[in-house]
């Protein structure tokens, strides 16, 4: 690895004691502060699982799959990175152990190691380090923040921790900073903060050759200076380098909290970066103040098949929140299991809802319940928003109940349907890598709701699907002058957006607009949906 021309600074974020500490939020918050101060920042996630990517992993295990512009199926933390930073991540932003081992094995098969015995050290660790420099060069970053997935002590993380240990030797002390996050438990009964888990986690990391310069303590209560001094003495770390990450009701409060404690000043000092302006976080403060003083409420029914784990729809929930905040209203999501929706009980699910959203999904489970929900929204003039599978099912519902195409269906659900209004565009080889992924253009038809919402002719949105509306049926659908295909991919003439003229707000899209929504820049479709729901 040639490091002479690389001027990038690296911040490595590790976690100890327990998983799900919020390393991703810490990384994203620091990234936003440093960007605000004038640095070009990118964030990279190193995941120690053997899967090549999370694309074929169950949503129940992994939550949503976040898709980048260039078509990478990635960890949901990349969604946090993009929302906090307002910067697009890429395929290089998420590296898994599966990718690393696959690359090394392929090189071995191609003879690139010249007959040497291939080992974790140096071959796996060198491959990891190459991924770090590739991302830094690709994004032209001043600072790359690298989150190491998992917990210190996990056997899967060992090669990654060894690789980042070596990076300091490769790049130099002033170009690398290690930040460790730990949980500091609070015992309510005795009103004590316990530091022992942090001490052990810190010790374990030092035993691996990594001495963190910054310690971020996750806690439900403020940590006093006496406790910080104790941790400082026992962990051999400057007490001024110990910061707290208090539990917050609003995620974006973390940006202000860390900035208020001066974490960015400490980082710039370590890197010897000078003459950067102080962070202007006024827009974030205004957003938080608005969230704390919401006056109205909007109730959105989310009809899904993975609702047991809300993280399966994380970006959709965040996009709904972004739009709701713009209209000064609190979002209440009514989580509805599509499998439980029947024609007999349907009104009980939706009678108190302002809008209905049917999101993505794969397979035929819970399909009919979603179609019933779409029919209820259409026939009762309730604002409806369909995303990905939600659009396909809106097409099926209209075909069956308005066009009277009996047994109309998707080829994904019924390969023998007499009316395949949804058809496959990609031939299966295996489940991985057969989807239409990434950003594609869409031309918006004049005099449609979609064109008015976007206020532009060409848009670019991210996709993740195998099936499309069958183009042979479009003329039949549009014949009655109510159903409109309002968005078309010009390169392949694929249907991207459908809407109904006669309905107050009925729009369904094949793409995933939630991936482009930002806290300070809500996506126009989500804004339109929430606005219509408030008027319902």
UniProtKB/Swiss-Prot annotation:
One of its GO terms (molecular function) is CTP synthase activity. One of its GO terms (cellular component) is cytosol. Residues 306-536 form the Glutamine amidotransferase type-1 domain. Its EC number is 6.3.4.2. The keyword Metal-binding applies. One of its GO terms (biological process) is pyrimidine nucleobase biosynthetic process. It catalyses: UTP + L-glutamine + ATP + H2O = CTP + L-glutamate + ADP + phosphate + 2 H(+); L-glutamine + H2O = L-glutamate + NH4(+); UTP + NH4(+) + ATP = CTP + ADP + phosphate + 2 H(+). Keywords: ATP-binding, Glutamine amidotransferase, Ligase, Magnesium, Metal-binding, Nucleotide-binding, Pyrimidine biosynthesis. L-glutamine binds at residues 60, 361, 389-392, 412, 466. It holds the Pfam family CTP_synth_N. It comes from the Bacteria. It is an enzyme of class 6 (ligase). Disulfide bonds: none annotated. InterPro entries: Class_I_gatase-like, CTP_synthase, CTP_synthase_N, GATASE, GATase1_CTP_Synthase, P-loop_NTPase. Mg(2+) binds at residues 77, 147. Allosterically activated by GTP, when glutamine is the substrate; GTP has no effect on the reaction when ammonia is the substrate. The allosteric effector GTP functions by stabilizing the protein conformation that binds the tetrahedral intermediate(s) formed during glutamine hydrolysis. Inhibited by the product CTP, via allosteric rather than competitive inhibition. ATP binds at residues 20-25, 77. Residues 1-273 are annotated as: Amidoligase domain. Pathway: Pyrimidine metabolism; CTP biosynthesis via de novo pathway; CTP from UDP: step 2/2. Catalyzes the ATP-dependent amination of UTP to CTP with either L-glutamine or ammonia as the source of nitrogen. Regulates intracellular CTP levels through interactions with the four ribonucleotide triphosphates. Homotetramer. NCBIfam families: PRK05380.1 (NF003792), PyrG (TIGR00337). This is CTP synthase.
């Amino acid at each position: 690895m040639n490091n002479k021309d690389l001027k990038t600074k690296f911040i490595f974020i590790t976690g100890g004691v327990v998983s799900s500490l919020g390393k991703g939020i810490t990384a994203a918050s620091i990234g936003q502060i440093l960007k605000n101060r004038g640095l070009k920042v990118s964030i990279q996630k190193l995941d120690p699982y053997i899967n090549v990517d999370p694309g074929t992993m169950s949503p129940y295990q992994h939550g949503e799959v976040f898709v980048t512009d260039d078509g990478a199926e990635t960890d949901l933390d990349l969604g946090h990175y993009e929302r906090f930073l307002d910067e697009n991540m890429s395929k290089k932003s998420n590296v898994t152990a599966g990718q690393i081992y696959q690359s090394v094995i392929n090189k071995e098969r191609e003879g690139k190691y010249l007959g040497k015995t291939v080992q974790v050290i140096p071959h796996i660790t060198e491959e990891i380090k190459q991924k770090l420099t590739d991302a830094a060069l690709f994004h032209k970053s001043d600072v790359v923040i690298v989150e190491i997935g998992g917990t210190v002590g996990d056997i899967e993380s060992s090669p990654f921790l060894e690789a980042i240990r070596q990076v300091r030797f490769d790049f130099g002390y002033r170009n690398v900073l290690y930040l460790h996050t730990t949980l500091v438990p609070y015992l309510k009964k005795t009103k004590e903060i316990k530091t022992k888990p942090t001490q052990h986690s810190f010790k374990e990391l030092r035993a691996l050759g990594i001495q963190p310069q910054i310690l971020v303590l996750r806690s439900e209560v403020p940590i006093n200076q006496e406790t910080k001094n104790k941790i400082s003495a026992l962990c051999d770390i400057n007490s001024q380098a110990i910061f707290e990450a208090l539990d917050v009701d609003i995620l974006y409060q973390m940006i202000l909290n860390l900035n208020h404690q001066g974490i960015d000043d400490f980082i710039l000092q370590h890197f010897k970066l000078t003459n950067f302006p102080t962070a202007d976080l006024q827009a974030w403060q205004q957003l938080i103040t608005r969230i704390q003083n919401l006056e109205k409420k909007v109730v959105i029914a989310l009809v899904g098949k993975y609702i047991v784990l809300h993280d399966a729809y994380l970006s959709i929930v965040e996009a709904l929140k972004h739009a709701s905040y713009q209209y000064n209203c609190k979002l209440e999501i009514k989580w509805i299991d599509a499998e439980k929706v029947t024609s007999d009980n349907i009104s009980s699910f939706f009678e108190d809802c302002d809008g209905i959203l049917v999101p993505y999904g794969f397979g035929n489970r819970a399909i009919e319940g979603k179609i019933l929900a779409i029919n209820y929204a259409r026939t009762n003039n309730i604002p409806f928003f369909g995303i990905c599978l939600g659009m396909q099912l809106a097409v099926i519902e209209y075909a069956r109940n308005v066009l009277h195409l009996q047994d109309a269906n998707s080829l994904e659900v019924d390969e023998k349907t007499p009316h395949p209004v949804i058809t496959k565009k990609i031939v299966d080889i295996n489940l991985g890598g057969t989807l239409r992924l990434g950003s594609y253009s869409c031309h918006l038809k004049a005099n449609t709701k979609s064109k008015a919402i976007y206020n532009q002719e060409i848009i670019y949105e991210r996709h993740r699907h195998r099936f499309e509306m069958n183009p042979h049926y479009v003329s039949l659908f549009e014949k009655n002058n109510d159903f409109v295909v309002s968005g078309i991919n010009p390169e392949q003439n694929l249907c991207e957006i459908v809407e109904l003229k006669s309905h107050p707000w009925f729009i369904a899209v094949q793409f995933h607009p939630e991936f482009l929504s930002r806290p300070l820049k809500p996506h126009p479709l989500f804004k339109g949906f929430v606005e219509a729901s408030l008027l319902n």
